[in-house]
Amino acid sequence: MNIEDKIPDLVWTKELNCGITVCDGYGNIIYMNDKAILLKHGNLTGKNIFECHNPDSCRIIRHLLETGGQHIYTIEKNGIHKLLYQSAWKEKGIIQGLCEIMVELSEPIPHFIR
């Protein structure tokens, strides 16, 4: 059973114009939306997130899974700037895994003070 069957409300993320990857508390990828599959060059569902990252990234991911925290940063890859938001996801206050949202950024990014 895939996560969309378990959580029918997740269906709205399937065609969202940002990459969404979700893993369980052991780092097993349990969901990728269409954009994440495209950005990662294939469906990694069933693979372990720790096999896809370097040791520094794995350390950060483990920390997020232990503390329930978040990590926000930008990268540039092949000339494309991306914002990455990683956050532990919880159920009834208990950490269940990690969610990563990847957004391709336009140049320049408007910044407003409100």
Show where each model-derived region lies:
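Sensory modules in modular signal-transduction proteins
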Residues: M1-D34
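Sensory/regulatory domains in signal-transduction proteins
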Residues: Y26, Y31, K35-R114
